[in-house]
């Protein structure tokens, strides 16, 4: 009888240890899987496309040019009240932008996340202010320049954002592809008017004279 009691106690102890191990190891797993403390959001994606009678390389040359950031006020006259650039214009560069009165959002920061020359792909993420103050937890612009012929391409722009459910009706009418469309229009116009300009100095001169 004594042996059976000892075995029973041992099994109980073993079970307790295993349960504790499950709790200790299982909780990080649940955190990792997003089951605990998960913030519920709604994902939205909006798109804009512009066909351009210029090569994808010519269009991408401007989009990927590190000097583009400092010339945004020249490319989009009247849009900015203030523009501060932190970085060299490449990946990791942060733009602190304040727009003219009456524009919304009035101020926010964005960061260049990706500049992929092979696939002509650029990603820019809003990291502070703007829609992030209105329940948006993630906001990413993507520009993809896709060739459709030797001297033709399409600029595919999109915005993906994640927003808390209670803010969806507030931000949905505000977030549009307008800024991406304005940039695509400005760059395509620049390239079409100055097709012979292919290096950085020529592009800079062309932008300044827009």
UniProtKB/Swiss-Prot annotation:
One of the protein's GO biological processes: defense response
Thermal dependence: Optimum temperature is 40 degrees Celsius.
Tissue: Expressed most abundantly in the rhizomes and to a lesser extent in petioles, roots, leaves and flower buds.
Comment field (misc): May be a member of a small family of three to five members.
Taxonomic lineage: Eukaryota, Viridiplantae, Streptophyta, Embryophyta, Tracheophyta
Enzyme Commission number(s) of this protein: 3.5.99.14
pH effects: Optimum pH is 7.0.
Top EC group: hydrolase
Binding site for (4-hydroxyphenyl)acetaldehyde: 141
The UniProt record lists the keyword Hydrolase: yes
CDD domains found in the cross-reference section: Bet_v1-like (cd07816)
Name under which the protein is recorded: S-norcoclaurine synthase
